[in-house]
Amino acid sequence: MSENTRKVTVAVIGSGNIGTDLMIKVIRHSEVLQMGAMVGIDPDSDGLARARRLGVPTTSDGVQGLLQLPNFDEIDVIFDATSAKAHEANAALLEPLGKRLIDLTPAALGPFVVPAVNLDEHRDAANVNMVTCGGQATIPIVAAVSRVTPVAYAEIVASIASKSAGPGTRANIDEFTETTSHAIETVGGARRGKAIIILNPADPPLIMRDTVLCLISAPDPATHDAIRDSIQTMVDHVATYVPGYRLKQQVQITPVPDGQPVRTLLASGDAATPTHQVSVFLEVEGAAHYLPAYAGNLDIMTSAAVRYAESVADTIAAPTAAQGATR
């Protein structure tokens, strides 16, 4: 963003863990975004209390309260960190008013965005969906494999600390699996995808860990080397906006044992005969801006959402900059 371009003003709906972490990231770390409002429904929530202390306009009356704020017209982008059902109602109110929505729920009303894979594909969309924490962590790996060879089936298992799962996450478990599975196919490129989430009750809490399994039909070692290189490049890319994202161990590519009924996992009508399984083990440590370091699942969502908002900031702010140049 140039020096003459104004900062893009954002609002956050949802004053829980994700919403509060978004606010902290915008205030402390973004050079192109600025907070315009924090919206909640619990006047005693920690998120609203922190926002007030930081001088951010607040309302505990939900989206209706946001509409009544004196600076509502100045807000360009709205992050929705509520729930899938709540987002449907919020979008119905806000989209007609010309606000850009970044949806951090599994509602998936708009196109999926995973910054490391398709950051520039939906820059003009009125409402984009950030998939899920498991999707943000694992879909880049599926895409990295797909760029080298077709993926007949991809399965991801996201294990997160139970303490990091708030009411919104717990209420959306079914939507999590459905949305992530769909995005594994549409963004990751797998012909069939499956997602599993595990809430790990261990105490002290463990950081987010993800397993990605891909079935491929590629027996040659050269392709295997290319897959490993593609995955490492992708991990490095994601780590530019989620520094705690890393491989837990080396990528494993193993032959599918004879007689293994892997074809039962494939999409209906898929004639592929998988020869190898690619196994990738990841961990995601949070940046601890607001959330504990073990909550990498929440940190990767907020980091991805901010990354997308910053990527479209020039487009949103450009008209004002152009007007200023003509004065």
Swiss-Prot record:
Gene3D superfamilies: Dihydrodipicolinate Reductase, domain 2, NAD(P)-binding Rossmann-like Domain. It comes from Rhodococcus jostii (strain RHA1). NAD(+) binds at S15, G16, N17, I18, S164, A165, G166, P167, G168, T169, R170, A171, N172, N297. One of its GO terms (biological process) is catabolic process. This is Acetaldehyde dehydrogenase 5. The active site is at C133. Belongs to the acetaldehyde dehydrogenase family. GO terms for molecular function: acetaldehyde dehydrogenase (acetylating) activity; NAD binding. The keyword Oxidoreductase applies. It is an enzyme of class 1 (oxidoreductase). Its EC number is 1.2.1.10. It comes from the Bacteria. It catalyses: acetaldehyde + NAD(+) + CoA = acetyl-CoA + NADH + H(+). HAMAP family: Ac_ald_DH_ac.
